[in-house]
Amino acid sequence: FDNIYVSFSGGKDSGVLLNMCIDYIRKNNLKIRLGVFHMDYEIQYKMTIDYVDRILEANKDILDVYRVCIPFRVSTCTSMYQSFWRPWEDSKKNIWVRSMPKKAMTKEDFPFYNTSMWDYEFQMRFAQWLHNKKDAVRTCCLIGIRTQESFNRWRCIYMSRKFQMYHKYKW
């Protein structure tokens, strides 16, 4: 693969995967940069945000960070009146939970973005956008997940046209 990036949420699974990649690059003194795709949902636990900031800053010498702050649609079950909400919605900037991170990529950075787009659709379109931007021949997106947690996660793994790699670790 000539283009590799990790999808990093700031959670345990993607955090372990990202740290394993960083350790491998450093341990083997590889002269490559690893892409990191982080969808910043605005409303996240402070400790998660702090962890994301810390890991990205500490490894900026080997990471190409794509921290996206996009007002895509996100499903919600917290309202009787809305079926979705939008992080980083411009018209609601006065009630944002926190300030947008420095160097965040916004909707202006992505020509494919449209207001009817859901977060999962954005992920898929981002992959194609990055592949084209890097003029890549083969792109690899690494995702650290436990399939027991979500049917959608399981479905993503077993969709066609993907390589599945499992290392034989003694957990």
Q: Which residues are covered by each model-predicted region?
A:
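ATP-dependent adenylation/nucleotidyltransferase module used to activate substrates
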Residues: 1-171
